[in-house]
């Protein structure tokens, strides 16, 4: 009798608990892939799948136990119990059920499919509620911001500037999907808000159009079109098409501001029904001039055909100035005075983990550009790093989601690091071969090139080699699905 009780307890603990533990790691990855099975399957490989068994591994972003995740866990538990019971009945061997842990990936995918009708119904209800809220605010000005990169920073800059005149709301964090925007509207948008700034992210054709159908923006900003998320977009043409879904959605009396510094945008001469303003660091409808840097930040002038404005900001880097230029264009369109714009720009702060400079009590300067990375942004970060006279150290895992150009771009990145830094610490083996090859071709000595398994190991190395007066650039941090 006691033996049977022990066996049953073991079956519950190991036969259900162990598969569920592995399922939680898989649910974590599914959540980072927007609960889309197609993206989840693309992530799956033997190498990646085996990594889900490392449940003690520290995560960059922990699993968020949303109501959806809790429903998914409940369905997984039910599936595990049913399958385990079937295995025991068929084999008459309770230990065979432990093999179910090897199929956690399939259990999570099946649970996601089974829950899909319920989730779709719930999401539609939330969507309809958000739509109703927007329709009840006909005087609300909605500004949409999208781009391969730069959209989050631009959103923050624009929010700070427009707040000098309007009661403004922006989508928080990286809430840039349809469901993220829906949640923002339902939880944060109030009748007293005058401007709503919506960040729009995309990983495949149609994503921007979907958000536009919800919010119907009257003003849009496209910060960049470049090779990003290529595993899902497959081509630069698809990236361009998707970003310009915003242009297609704007009304005839609307305004579109686009960054002409990117060739894909500059070469797109299609006419849209809305008014279009091209901005650039050099020559365009609106451009920059008289840029000067100092220890306190940057002075620059934004120039248009019939107006110009001199500004000062604590931000550094030309790409940040481009994002500010787009914000100034929208501020002008919405009637802010030059004085309001100047005050707003002077109050803009760097967004956390996006080229923010921090001076540590130890005397070390940290350039934190760890949110994500791309060829354009990485070059700008290295340009900033090269301006520091002290020993310069780069800590990076390289760039991801660049499709078949990933090796080539990371090799170029390595060569750029060699020209801008004294020491390189390459984190993770995802891009290690490409970056180290570029570092060597760029002329960096092997003794200055180090490879760390993870950020924790990189930190240990830094503690040994860094000293007061040094400058450390953290360029990118890989999502958990790549670790």
Say what each PLM segment does.
Residues 1-94, 99-116, 330-337, 343-353, ...:
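ATP-dependent carboxylate-amine ligase
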Residues 2-75, 79-256, 260, 264-272, ...:
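Phosphate-binding loop of NTP-binding sites
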Residues 146-148, 172-173, 200-201, 224-225, ...:
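Fold-independent oxyanion-binding glycine-rich loops
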Residues 153, 179, 206, 322, ...:
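Residues that form or flank phosphate/diphosphate-binding pockets in enzymes
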Residues 158, 162, 181-185, 324-334, ...:
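Buried hydrophobic packing segments
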Residues 182, 208, 233-236, 324-325, ...:
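Conserved strand-to-helix beginnings and helix N-cap segments that scaffold or border functional pockets
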Residues 191-194, 296-300, 467-476:
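A polyampholytic, Gly/Pro-enriched intrinsically disordered region
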Residues 222-365, 390, 411, 415-423, ...:
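Acidic, Mg2+-coordinating active-site environments of NTP-dependent enzymes
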């Amino acid at each position: 009798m006691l033996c049977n009780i022990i066996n049953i307890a073991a079956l519950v603990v190991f036969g259900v608990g162990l598969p569920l533990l592995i399922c939680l790691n898989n649910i974590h990855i599914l959540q980072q892939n927007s609960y889309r099975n197609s993206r989840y399957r693309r992530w799956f490989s033997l190498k990646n799948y085996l990594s889900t068994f490392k449940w003690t591994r520290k995560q960059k972003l922990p699993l968020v136990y949303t109501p959806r995740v809790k429903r998914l866990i409940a369905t997984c538990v039910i599936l595990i119990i049913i399958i385990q019971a079937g295995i025991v009945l068929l084999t008459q061997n309770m230990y065979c059920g432990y093999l179910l842990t090897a199929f956690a990936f399939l259990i999570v995918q099946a649970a996601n499919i089974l829950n899909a009708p319920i989730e779709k119904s719930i999401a539609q209800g939330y969507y309809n509620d958000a739509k109703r809220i927007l329709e009840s605010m006909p005087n609300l000005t909605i500004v949409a911001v999208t781009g391969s990169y730069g959209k989050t920073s631009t959103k923050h800059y624009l929010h700070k500037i427009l707040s000098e005149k309007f009661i403004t709301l922006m989508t928080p964090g990286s809430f840039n999907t349809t469901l993220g925007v829906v949640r923002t509207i339902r939880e944060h948008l109030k009748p007293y808000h005058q401007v709503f700034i919506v960040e729009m992210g995309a990983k495949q054709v149609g994503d921007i159009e979907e958000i536009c159908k919800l919010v119907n923006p009257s003003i849009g900003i496209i910060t960049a079109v470049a090779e990003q998320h290529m595993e899902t977009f497959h081509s630069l043409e698809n990236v361009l098409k998707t970003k310009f879904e915003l242009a297609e959605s704007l009304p005839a009396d609307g305004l579109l501001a686009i960054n002409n510094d990117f060739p894909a945008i500059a070469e797109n001469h299609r006419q849209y029904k809305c008014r279009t303003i091209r901005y650039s660091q050099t020559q365009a409808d609106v451009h920059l001039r008289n840029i000067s840097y100092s220890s306190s930040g940057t002075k620059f002038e934004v120039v248009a055909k019939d107006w110009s404005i001199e500004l000062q900001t604590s931000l550094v880097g030309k790409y940040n100035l481009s994002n500010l230029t787009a914000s100034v264009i929208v501020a002008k369109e919405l009637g802010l005075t030059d004085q309001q714009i100047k005050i707003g720009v002077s109050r803009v702060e760097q967004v956390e983990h996006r080229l923010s400079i921090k001076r540590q009590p130890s005397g070390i300067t940290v350039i934190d550009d760890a949110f994500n990375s791309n060829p354009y942004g990485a070059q700008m970060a290295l340009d900033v790093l090269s301006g520091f006279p002290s020993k310069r150290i780069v800590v990076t895992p390289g760039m991801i989601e660049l499709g078949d150009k990933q090796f080539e771009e990371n090799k170029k990145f390595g060569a750029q690091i060699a020209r801008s830094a004294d020491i390189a610490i390459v984190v993770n083996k995802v891009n290690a071969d490409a970056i180290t090859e570029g570092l060597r071709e760029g002329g960096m000595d092997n003794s200055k090139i180090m490879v760390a398994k993870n950020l924790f190991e990189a930190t240990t190395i830094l503690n040994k080699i860094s000293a007061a007066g040094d400058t450390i650039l953290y360029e990118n941090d890989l999502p958990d699905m790549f670790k």
